């Protein structure tokens, strides 16, 4: 799974270059999570998860607080959670998750992004079956052996543990996300380099240079869309 960890690193690195856009997306996601349940992460697991993710992207406290206060204030703005599936150049696969207050606008924007960049929209289920929803938690300062030991002590089962670039990455079932984090916290870990519930491809594909360039443009256009929260794909973008 090392390659998959590299794809997550590449995604985070690319997002560092557009922090204002990332903060806006987190603000929306935090607002929705807080509005759908209690605005307290201790009793709202969805909100707690988003806040843990936000920490790994260094989202400022004032953005988090503003989104939660907006939800507390009874704001009437409502968002729908949508998932689109499609194909890029040479049969590459893409999943797009969105939060939108205008479904027609978002569907049109996503369809146009695919159509103008060598891809096409698929029907629901046409792509997702080739991905596995996975909790991915990364920490520094622990070895693979230490991580295995602390998880065993906490009686937490995981799919895999990888050690790479001084970072230990744990892959687990989505419903084990908080248990894995809590096991690390009990062992003195306070910061996480990765804290995601993501869609990992079962197999990755490589593209020729021309197709790869077109595919990267497709992903860039999708991630630039205001309503798009996450983009997952099965292409190995390593050099």
From Swiss-Prot:
Gene3D superfamilies (alphabetical): 1.10.10.200, 3.30.70.980
Stretches assigned to coiled coil: none
Gene Ontology biological process terms, A to Z: regulation of DNA-templated transcription
SUPFAM superfamilies cross-referenced by the UniProt entry: YebC-like (SSF75625)
InterPro entries: Integrase-like_N, TACO1_YebC-like_2nd/3rd_dom, TACO1_YebC_N, Transcrip_reg_TACO1-like, Transcrip_reg_TACO1-like_dom3, Transcrip_reg_TACO1_YeeN, YebC-like
Entry GO terms, CC: cytosol
GO molecular function, one term: DNA binding
Origin superkingdom: Bacteria
Signal peptide: none
Keyword set, alphabetical order: Cytoplasm, DNA-binding, Transcription, Transcription regulation
Pfam families named among the record's database cross-references: TACO1_YebC_N, Transcrip_reg
The keyword Isomerase is assigned to this record: no
Compartments, record wording: Cytoplasm
Family indicated by similarity: Belongs to the TACO1 family. YeeN subfamily.
Name this protein carries in UniProt: Probable transcriptional regulatory protein BPUM_0743
